[in-house]
């Protein structure tokens, strides 16, 4: 299975969730914003959002500044 992640093809196992994807990218404990098929998700929905072939994702990491 493959998804589009930040504009690039990204192979991944079937039946993966947003939570699983973030863990595989090393972002599980980082503050991020996830857009799934052009819809921004709440973090509470990451576990229940199962990814499908050809889904489109944008993941933006949040960095504090000052």
Indicate where each model-derived feature is located.
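Ubiquitin-like/PB1-type beta-grasp interaction modules and other compact soluble beta-rich domains
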Residues: 1-65
């Amino acid at each position: 299975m493959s998804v589009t992640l930040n504009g690039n093809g990204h192979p991944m196992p079937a039946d993966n969730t947003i939570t699983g994807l973030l863990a595989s990218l090393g972002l599980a404990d980082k503050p991020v914003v996830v857009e799934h098929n052009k819809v921004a998700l709440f973090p509470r929905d990451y576990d229940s959002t199962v990814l499908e072939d050809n889904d489109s994702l944008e993941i933006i990491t949040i960095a504090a500044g000052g």
